[in-house]
Design a protein with these regions (language model features):
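Glycine/threonine-rich flexible loop motifs
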Residues: 12-17, 80-84, 93, 243-251, ...
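A short helix->loop->beta-strand "cap" motif at the edges of active sites that frequently abuts
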Residues: 31, 86-89, 110-112, 260-263, ...
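Rossmann-like adenosine-cofactor binding region
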Residues: 209-292
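Phosphate/diphosphate ligand-binding glycine-rich loop within oxidoreductases
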Residues: 66, 70-148
Length: 321
């Protein structure tokens, strides 16, 4: 098979579909790999490293797409890439089409065979190709949330941890899946008081066994419970995911009116349409906006902020496929 790895073109997206180590494994099985020039340069993967691994370097995306039978990417194609898609090409990447039906229609119109990382499901119901990026996004959500709580970022001007007799700040995590669990882990490491909200009592019980009771509160999801929790929170993490579907809008515009000015909301679910009614996609260049004095962070490719870690983690799980 002829495999192509184009450069990512989404805003501040520095991940790459294959590492040189992955290329070496694929080539050893008799396949041909074309990599676009400097596709991995920003994370230290030079053209020479790919050549030594057995890849051939091509200069343009047009060349990569025209030569390949299988395209391996990280993020969904953007408008400028649709021209390269065709009915005898297979695309293997994150697509997150549930929140963007127009993009789904455009992909269908090209005839391309598209396989979404995030919907590949194991026999046990887990999503092995989504999990590592969800975990990274969960950790990043606390990092960027804490940063945007700083006063010069329009936040409250607080640190989420406790200091001596100063009570810890409140972090609410909505959704107890992979991303939510990692966000909880990071928040507890920073000595925050964490409120966890989930639809499943069984999931809440599992999380309680994992994290205990100290500085933790476990809340069964309902509109009233969500409203009450976020009204006293300093940082709210939205980590809701429904396989292949648009994220439900669980925090309404009306709820924002009860929140304190400078509260930060991080919507990890934004690549599935967002789980806050007030959310809209943002970029690493311009990541935040205010609604009712509540700061929203809605970057659609959060793991792109740590591209080397994310690329290595992604390749570890995608290579077997």
């Amino acid at each position: 098979m002829i495999i192509g790895v184009p450069s990512e073109v989404k805003n501040n997206e520095f991940r790459v579909g294959l590492t040189p180590d992955s290329v070496q494994v694929i080539v050893s099985h008799g396949h041909t790999v074309f990599v676009q020039a400097e596709a991995g340069l920003s994370i230290g993967y030079t053209n020479d490293l790919y050549i030594k691994a057995g890849a051939t370097i091509l200069q343009s995306a047009a060349q990569i797409y025209s030569e390949a039978e299988l395209i391996i990417k990280v993020k969904e194609p953007i408008e400028s890439e649709y021209q390269y898609l065709r009915n005898d090409l297979t695309l293997f990447t994150y697509l997150h089409l549930a929140g963007d039906p127009e993009k789904a229609k455009k992909l269908i119109s090209t005839g391309v065979r598209a396989i979404a990382y995030e919907t590949v499901t194991s026999a046990d119901g887990s999503m092995p190709l989504l999990a590592p990026m969800s975990a990274i996004a969960g950790q990043i959500s606390i990092v960027v949330g804490s940063y945007h709580l700083l006063k010069h970022n329009s936040g409250k001007g607080v640190l989420i941890g406790s200091f001596g007799d100063i009570s810890p700040r409140v972090v609410t995590v909505i959704g107890g899946g992979v991303a939510g669990t990692e966000a909880i882990t990071k928040a507890t490491e920073n000595n925050a008081f964490v409120k966890v909200i989930d639809l499943s009592q069984n999931k809440l019980d599992e999380l309680k066994l994992q994290f205990g009771n100290e500085n933790m509160e476990y809340i069964l999801s309902s509109p009233e419970n969500i409203k009450d929790a976020i009204s006293v929170s300093d940082l709210v993490i939205g980590a809701v995911y429904v396989v292949g579907k648009e994220a439900p809008k669980i925090v309404t515009l009306e709820m924002l009116k009860n929140m304190k000015p400078g509260t930060v909301m991080v919507d990890i679910s934004i690549d599935q349409g967002g789980c806050f009614e007030s959310s809209r996609p943002t970029t690493h260049d311009n990541p935040t906006f205010l609604v009712d004095e509540v700061l929203h962070y809605c970057v659609t490719n959060m793991p792109g902020a740590v591209p080397l870690t994310a690329t290595q983690a992604l390749n570890k799980v995608t290579l077997p496929y």
